[in-house]
C-alpha cells in the first residue's frame, strides 16, 4: 500500500446496536402488522387517529420528562402537575366563568411555579432529584385536592351552598381536545408539532446541545464554562410546563376536571 494512504475499514454491522437504536420501532411495526392481520378494522383511518389521540396527552408529559432525564435528573411530580392544571383550567370556566386569558395563563403559571420550585430544591438546595420531586408530587396533590375539595369539576355540578356551578366548558377550549382540522384531531396535530419542535431544539440548537452536555458529564460541562445550573433549571421548568399543557389538553378532551387524572401519567410517560 502506498505511503500516506490509510485503509479505511467499514464499520461492522452490530445486531446489538441495531436493536438498541431501532428495536422499539421494530416492535411497534410488528405489533401493528399482527393486529392488522387478525383484525381487519385495526389498520383503518378512524382507529389509527383514535390511537394517536389517546397517546397525545401522554406524549406531552413524556417530552417534559425527557428534558429532566437529559440533564441527569428525574421529575416525579409530572403526574400531580397534570392533575393540578386539569382542575384549575376547568374551574376557571365552570366556577369563575373566566375567558381565554385566565383559563390559559393561570394553569400555565402554576405549572411554571412547580418547575421553579423543583429546580430550586434540586439545583440550589441540592436535594436529590428523586426526593425533591417526590415531595413536590405529594405537595401538589394536596394542593389540588384541597382546591377542588376532592371533587371532579364539570358543568352544572352542585356546589357546597346547594347552588349549581354557573359556568361551563367553553367551545374554544373543547375544540383543543375534541376538534379536527382537515379530518385530523387537533391533539394529534399539536403533538406532531411539539415533537418536531422539540427534536429541532434538542438536535440542532446550541441550548439543546448544552442540555445533553450537562447531563452527560456535569463536572466536565461546568469546567467547560457551561452554566449547568441554568440548564438544569430550564429542564425542570420545561418538564413541569409540558406536564401542565398535557393536563389542560386532557381537560379539553374529556370535558371534565378530574382530580385523579394524572395519577398514572408518570409511568406512562416514562415508558413512552
Spell out what each predicted region is.
Residues 55-64, 80, 84, 116, ...:
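Hydrophobic alpha-helical segments embedded in the membrane of multi-pass proteins
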Residues 129-204, 231-234, 254-262:
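Transmembrane helix-bundle core of multi-pass membrane transporters
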Amino acid at each position: 500500500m502506498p505511503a500516506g494512504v490509510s485503509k479505511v475499514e467499514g464499520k461492522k454491522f452490530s445486531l446489538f446496536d441495531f436493536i438498541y437504536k431501532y428495536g422499539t420501532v421494530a416492535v411497534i411495526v410488528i405489533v401493528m402488522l399482527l393486529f392488522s392481520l387478525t383484525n381487519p378494522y385495526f389498520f383503518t383511518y378512524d382507529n389509527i387517529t383514535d390511537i394517536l389521540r389517546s397517546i397525545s396527552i401522554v406524549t406531552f408529559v413524556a417530552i417534559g420528562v425527557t428534558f429532566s432525564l437529559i440533564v441527569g435528573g428525574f421529575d416525579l411530580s409530572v403526574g400531580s402537575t397534570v392533575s393540578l392544571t386539569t382542575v384549575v383550567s376547568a374551574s376557571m370556566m365552570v366556577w369563575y366563568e373566566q375567558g381565554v386569558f385566565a383559563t390559559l395563563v393561570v394553569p400555565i403559571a402554576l405549572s411554571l411555579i412547580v418547575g421553579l420550585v423543583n429546580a430550586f430544591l434540586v439545583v440550589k438546595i441540592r436535594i436529590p432529584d428523586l426526593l425533591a420531586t417526590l415531595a413536590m408530587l405529594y405537595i401538589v396533590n394536596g394542593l389540588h385536592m384541597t382546591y377542588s375539595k376532592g371533587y371532579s369539576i364539570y358543568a352544572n355540578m352542585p356546589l357546597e351552598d346547594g347552588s349549581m356551578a354557573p359556568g361551563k366548558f367553553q367551545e374554544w377550549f373543547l375544540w383543543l381536545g375534541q376538534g379536527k382540522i382537515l379530518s385530523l384531531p387537533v391533539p394529534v396535530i399539536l403533538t406532531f408539532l411539539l415533537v418536531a419542535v422539540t427534536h429541532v431544539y434538542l438536535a440542532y440548537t446550541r441550548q439543546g446541545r448544552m442540555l445533553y452536555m450537562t447531563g452527560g458529564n456535569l463536572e466536565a460541562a461546568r469546567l467547560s464554562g457551561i452554566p449547568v445550573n441554568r440548564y438544569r433549571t430550564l429542564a425542570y421548568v420545561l418538564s413541569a410546563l409540558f406536564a401542565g399543557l398535557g393536563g389542560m389538553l386532557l381537560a379539553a378532551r374529556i370535558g371534565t376536571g378530574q382530580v385523579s387524572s394524572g395519577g398514572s401519567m408518570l409511568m406512562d410517560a416514562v415508558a413512552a
